[in-house]
């Protein structure tokens, strides 16, 4: 749907495996062997769909990754000006779309990178004295209309960028049961 580039196809597949593993790591149906392998890892890579042309379906594609039953666990609202709130969303959402990724300020990139690799969350809820350990279930994806969005001299290994050459097919229905069953089996 997005690109035939082998680097994208392989990288996006691995990211989807990480996304589904993160969702299942604390699920009661997950066997202990799989849980042990995934519990200390975070899906620390984020695909970025990039095109200077608007209307290619970047944001729509991101929304389509979530089946209707899980739409409440998808957000495009992610504010890095409040680190505690940003961290709490890692336990509250399954997929966070960094829509218009290029609008994030360079000063917020270290915080974003730290949050992307965080696997253990200790969050203090309002009116509580101590923090609670919560599972990290969120994965990140992003979109941008600018091709020059990654300017970090230390590298950008956390982002899998694809430059769109055509509109994304967002009209063909996603077979969610088949998609997520296959990811779970892998």
Language-model segments: which ranges?
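P-loop NTPase catalytic core of nucleic-acid-dependent motor ATPases
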Residues: 1-91
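Feature primarily recognizes SF3-like P-loop helicase cores of small DNA viruses
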Residues: 28, 37, 42-45, 72-77, ...
């Amino acid at each position: 749907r997005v690109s035939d580039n082998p680097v994208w196809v392989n990288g996006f597949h691995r990211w989807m495996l990480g996304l589904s593993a993160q969702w299942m790591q604390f699920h009661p149906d997950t066997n202990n062997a799989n849980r042990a392998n995934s519990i200390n890892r975070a899906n620390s890579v984020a695909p970025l769909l990039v095109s200077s042309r608007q209307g290619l379906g970047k944001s729509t594609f991101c929304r389509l990754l979530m089946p209707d039953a899980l739409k409440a666990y998808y957000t495009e609202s992610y504010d890095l000006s409040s680190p505690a709130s940003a961290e709490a969303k890692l336990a509250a959402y399954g997929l966070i779309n960094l829509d218009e990724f290029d609008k994030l300020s360079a000063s917020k990139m270290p915080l974003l990178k730290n949050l992307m690799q965080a696997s253990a969350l200790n969050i203090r809820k309002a009116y509580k004295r101590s923090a609670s350990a919560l599972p990290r279930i969120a994965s990140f994806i992003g979109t941008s209309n600018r091709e020059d969005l990654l300017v970090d001299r230390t590298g950008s290994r956390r982002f899998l960028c694809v430059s769109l050459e055509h509109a994304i097919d967002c009209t063909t229905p996603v077979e969610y049961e088949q998609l997520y069953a296959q990811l779970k089996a892998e």
